[in-house]
């Protein structure tokens, strides 16, 4: 498993981000999805293939996290192999090309977010099929090289259920074995909710904050294991 750098999050996830499966991290804007993905890549050995579809990956932010943790900047930053995908077609091609790039030296793949271009497409049926194929490629890579795959996901408002829901919920839920939802309660306070896990009870909650170091536990607030 890969550590998240947070004792509480690791405990919530049964030890950390597991290898050989897809882990979905979803939530509204500015809840910490990108920071969490970067931090996991930062703190674990092995290369990271990072596909940025939103322009959210910030080398400056990553460098600040490295500096704040007293890590060696050169060796750490060189672990990240960054790809940009500006539309859904390019995203599909980039994920497919990972089969030629990823090897045993990689510990993680990140697609942040995998639904950014999906949500603006009109032909949702064909796009969902393509999205499923992309997820299958990622799952194949996860199993072949025993690495972790994090796919971040955006949300939409479901008026019928009066709740925020992850985009492409059915196909994402089918392919992703572990699902983590992030929420912002108030400035400086966020929560992570375990929505699905292969062996941990669903509904566990931990609190965290975002600092210069990245994601950090908030010890003063007792983590709850009850469903929201």
Swiss-Prot record:
| Database matches in SUPFAM superfamilies | P-loop containing nucleoside triphosphate hydrolases (SSF52540)
Query: Has the keyword DNA-binding been applied to this entry?
Result: yes
Annotated membrane-spanning segments are none
Q: Which domain of life is it from?
A: Archaea
Q: Which UniProt keywords apply?
A: ATP-binding, DNA damage, DNA recombination, DNA-binding, Nucleotide-binding
| Pfam families listed in its UniProt record | Rad51
What SMART domains does the record point to? AAA
Please provide, alphabetically and separated by semicolons, the GO molecular function terms listed in this UniProt record.
Answer: ATP binding; ATP hydrolysis activity; ATP-dependent DNA damage sensor activity; damaged DNA binding
Gene Ontology biological process terms, A to Z? DNA recombination; DNA repair
**PANTHER family xref list:** DNA REPAIR AND RECOMBINATION PROTEIN RADB (PTHR22942:SF47), RECA/RAD51/RADA DNA STRAND-PAIRING FAMILY MEMBER (PTHR22942)
Quote the NCBIfam families the UniProt record gives: recomb_radB
**Its job:** Involved in DNA repair and in homologous recombination. May regulate the cleavage reactions of the branch-structured DNA. Has a very weak ATPase activity that is not stimulated by DNA. Binds DNA but does not promote DNA strands exchange.
State the similarity comment. Belongs to the eukaryotic RecA-like protein family. RadB subfamily.
Name the record gives this protein: DNA repair and recombination protein RadB
Record the organism: Thermococcus sibiricus (strain DSM 12597 / MM 739)
Organism ancestry: Archaea, Methanobacteriati, Methanobacteriota, Thermococci, Thermococcales
């Amino acid at each position: 498993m890969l550590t998240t750098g947070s004792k509480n999050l690791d405990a919530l996830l049964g030890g950390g981000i597991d290898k050989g499966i897809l882990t979905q991290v979803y939530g509204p804007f500015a809840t910490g999805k990108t920071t969490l993905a970067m931090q996991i890549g930062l703190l674990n050995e092995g290369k990271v293939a990072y596909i940025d579809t939103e322009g959210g990956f910030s080398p400056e932010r990553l460098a600040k996290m490295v500096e704040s943790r007293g890590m060696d900047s050169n060796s750490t930053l060189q672990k990240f192999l960054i790809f940009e995908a500006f539309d859904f077609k390019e995203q599909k091609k980039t994920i497919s090309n990972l089969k030629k790039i990823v090897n045993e030296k990689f510990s993680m793949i990140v697609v942040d977010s995998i639904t950014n271009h999906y949500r603006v497409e009109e032909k949702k049926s064909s796009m969902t099929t393509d999205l499923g194929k992309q997820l299958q490629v990622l799952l194949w890579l996860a199993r072949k090289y025993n690495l972790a795959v994090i796919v971040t996901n955006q949300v939409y408002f479901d008026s019928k259920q009066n709740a925020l829901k992850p985009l492409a919920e059915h196909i994402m839920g089918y392919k992703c074995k572990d699902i983590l939802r992030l929420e912002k309660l108030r400035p400086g306070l966020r929560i992570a909710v375990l929505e699905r896990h292969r062996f941990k009870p669903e509904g566990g909650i931990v609190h965290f904050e975002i600092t210069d170091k990245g994601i950090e536990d908030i010890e003063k607030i007792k983590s709850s294991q009850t469903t929201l």
